[in-house]
Amino acid sequence: MTSRIVLTYEDYAALPHDGKRYELHEGELSPRGAPSARHQLIIGNLYFILRVHVVATGRGQLFLSPFDCIMSDITVVQPDLVYVDESRRPLISERALEGAPTLAVEILSPWSRHIDRGVKMRLYARHGVEWYWIVDGDGLTIDAHRLEGDGYRLDARLEGTTPRALPPFPDLPLDPAAIWP
């Protein structure tokens, strides 16, 4: 019988800085592929829109990947975009966010689709991420999921061409034309 080796944050932090990206999912090392140009354009557009709003309102901090979110000693993730509201600001350290963000955003890629909708959705729920956006650049949708109990419920969807606010930013209508390249 083979026993599973469970890696910790200490093991993760000791990985060589060779340009490769990894996450730690419940003690198991998970490699991350390089994002596509479209992925980067979408996340850049979304970051710009949200950043202007967050700075103007003074409500929290926004981070782009790669940025570690240390959920536990055996779970470290790097969402594409992370929002931390004022109540969670004390969790921000020099090295990482040491706990769950208010919002985690993932842009679906062909290689990450099953991970973002499965493994990461469960990890985010287990560790108390209040909001989880799944951005589908092919379907031109953003699904805003709200944590309820031990899982997520679809709370709102941005689709089509009409601007719409998504939680946790009820006062920020997102214009699809400004997001999709």
Where are these regions (language model features)?
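Gly/Pro/Ser/Thr-rich low-complexity, intrinsically disordered segments predominantly at protein N-termini
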Residues: 1-181
